[in-house]
Regions:
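Conserved active-site alpha-helix within GNAT-family acetyltransferase domains
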Residues: 152, 164-166, 175-192, 196
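A short beta-loop-alpha structural element at the N-terminal edge
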Residues: 19-38, 42
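Conserved acyl-donor/pantetheine-binding loop and adjacent beta-alpha core of acyl/acetyltransferases
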Residues: 86-142, 146, 195-197
């Protein structure tokens, strides 16, 4: 009410954000993959792959490992200290495991969906910039921890590395809700990708020397 004194009981102090750092070892791979799986459980493209919940939780962890596992083995996966969020970056010149992705699709999806999925993969590969770049195939926050700023914290820490090396960064946004976050960090939309009735992916490029963006 008007004129009411403000006491400590009335002041909301949010919990501090967890620290962000590189994943210490592959022994923590399962924790990072579980976080990404939870974070993508409401993602339009991820659920286009696996619309049934049981199928999603059965197969999507294997998809994460095939698509972005090179970040974990390559020492370029960023995670929060409590594993509430993860950003799985691939170094310049490192690519998703195409053989593992093809094998997973053939094993986990009906044959009548293979052509559309493989077409989507092909278009994603063709959309990458020609110059060497850091690639962010997956960034996710546990659904229970979203809207706290963890995604921004992950982006801020990991993009420092791109700026230190003066190398572009590239990603495909599979969820329109995330595009404003990427725009704030200097990514620019450069097209749209879809295949076989899939939800659209928006490829986004962050060009060299964008140091000013990581401070916002």
């Amino acid at each position: 009410m008007l004129g009411e004194a403000i006491t400590a009981e009335h002041i909301f102090i949010p919990d501090p954000l967890p620290e962000v750092g590189l994943l210490e070892s592959v022994t923590h791979e399962a924790s990072a993959i579980a976080t990404v799986t939870m974070g993508f459980s409401t993602d339009p493209v991820a659920r286009w792959f696996y619309p049934e919940p049981a199928e999603y939780f059965r197969w999507f962890p294997q998809f994460v490992r095939a698509f972005a596992g090179g970040s974990i083995s390559g020492g370029s996966a960023y995670c929060t200290s409590d594993y509430s969020g993860a950003a799985l970056w691939l170094r310049p010149g490192v690519h998703p495991d195409e053989e593992a992705m093809v094998a997973l699709v053939e094993k986990s999806l009906p044959k009548d969906r293979h052509a559309a999925v493989f077409e989507l993969f092909e278009k994603m590969g063709a959309g990458h910039p020609d110059e060497l770049h850091w690639y962010l195939p997956m960034i996710a926050v546990d659904t229970h921890q979203q809207n706290r700023g963890i995604g921004s914290s992950l982006m801020r820490h990991s993009l420092e590395r791109c700026d230190a090396e003066n190398v572009p960064a590239y990603l495909e946004s599979s969820n329109p809700r995330n595009i404003p976050l990427y725009l704030r960090f200097g990514f620019e939309p450069i097209g749209e990708i879809s295949a076989g009735g899939s939800p659209p992916l928006v490829p986004m490029l962050r060009r060299r020397s964008r140091q000013s963006f990581i401070n916002h």
